[in-house]
From Swiss-Prot:
It catalyses: an acyl phosphate + sn-glycerol 3-phosphate = a 1-acyl-sn-glycero-3-phosphate + phosphate. It is an enzyme of class 2 (transferase). It comes from the Bacteria. This is Glycerol-3-phosphate acyltransferase. It is a multi-pass membrane protein.
């Protein structure tokens, strides 16, 4: 019993669980329910992120669909950022900060508040890593926005955005940047971000097949 109590009161465990719970807050689901009486998990792809929210609202002719989708995107991004910010605020070491980031991503994708359903996690991914690898993340966010704006293919923008940040972690750390934002100085490996990118590819497997077949839908 004492071992269980020690485990549950361990600050690393507490913050990992907290990161998971924060990431699990289903903003897209909540806003759609509150303002439109719609269950976003039963519409379109069933995802709770900005893309499905946008498609669902535009299909109903809602005039402020883009604004609501943008709000969902921002909230999903900031919940990942907030989880990591708390871990930094309380002085957790970098390896635990990365663990909290990953936990927040898993929380979004497998929300405990939605029977472990959720979204694909890209907004939360970019938010959670921006305080850990800001240079790579901001460039990745730029690519994500640019591809999404020009090609209007959300899945491709997401994959390229996270992919860009992942590729950059093999170059940026060797430049003259502060140790506090250098992944090799933080955890001595690029593995956490590589795993996040692999997870992104897995979550977008269906989209990748559609892209290769030329059948992937554009954002309306």
């Amino acid at each position: 019993m004492e071992g269980v109590l020690n485990f549950l009161t361990n600050i690393n465990v507490i913050f990992t669980l907290l990161g998971y719970l924060i990431g699990g807050i289903p903003f897209g689901y909540a806003l759609m329910k509150i303002f439109y009486g719609m269950d976003i998990t039963k519409i379109g792809s069933g995802g709770i992120g900005a893309t499905n929210v946008l498609r669902a609202l535009q299909s109903k002719g809602v005039s402020n669909a883009k604004q609501m989708a943008l709000l969902v995107l921002i909230l999903d991004l900031f919940k990942g950022m907030f989880a990591v910010f708390l871990s930094k605020l309380f002085g957790l070491d970098y390896s635990l900060q990365w663990m909290v980031a990953i936990a927040s991503i898993l929380g979004h994708c497998y929300s405990p508040f939605l029977n472990f359903n959720g979204g694909k996690g890209v907004s939360t991914i970019m938010g959670s890593v921006v305080l850990l690898i800001p240079i790579e993340s901001l460039i990745g966010l730029t690519v994500w926005f640019f591809v999404g704006k020009v090609l209007k293919i959300s899945s491709l923008a997401s994959i390229l955005g996270v992919g860009t940040a992942t590729v950059l972690i093999f170059f940026v750390p060797y430049m003259h940047i502060p140790d506090s934002v250098n992944i090799l100085k933080e955890v001595d490996t690029q593995t956490p971000m590589v795993l996040i990118f692999i997870f992104t590819l897995i979550k977008h497997a269906g989209n990748i097949f559609n892209l290769l077949a030329g059948k992937e839908k554009k954002v309306l």
